[in-house]
Amino acid sequence: LRMSRGLGDVYKRQDFTEYLRAIRKKGYTAFLSVHDDGSHFLNRTDKKILKKCGISKTPTFRQSFLAVIDDGKALYSNTGTEKLSYNCTIDDKQFSLLSQGKYNTIDADCSIKMNNQELTSPAGGMHVIVYNKKKHCLVDSVTFTLWRDRNFIR
């Protein structure tokens, strides 16, 4: 899938906290989904930024987590021990999200699809897909390995 680098310097951001600050810009929608665990290295500052977006409940160890942040505000967020799913339409594009942490199962799963095309990798952690509503395109797909460190995979 071709990505446009229309999010300015967010693509250069390698720290999850700085990345969260950058994706709160107007004109962007960010989709977040946890695979296996995305909480161990989620810090207090990360949680404050998510709270400013309207996400008051963040995942704890191996919980499922989904969020959609549009223009810096949460359109949807959910955390739990069961498999979570959510569907929405942005810019006439269908987005489908799924998160299954490893809290009570050995079968962790994660998916973010746009028009039935998978956008995530099989890596564990916090998956983030960013969509530019002005340019009508995806601008980033990244996984932060918050279960073991604060590294990222593109």
What are these regions (language model features)?
Residues 48-142, 147-148:
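Divalent-metal-activated hydrolytic enzyme cores
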Residues 8-9, 29, 65, 126:
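Residue-level detector of short, conserved catalytic/binding motifs and their immediate flanks
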Residues 1-11:
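Single conserved hydrophobic/aromatic residue that forms the stacking wall/gate
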Residues 12-45, 139-154:
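Short HxH-centered metal-ligating active-site micro-motif
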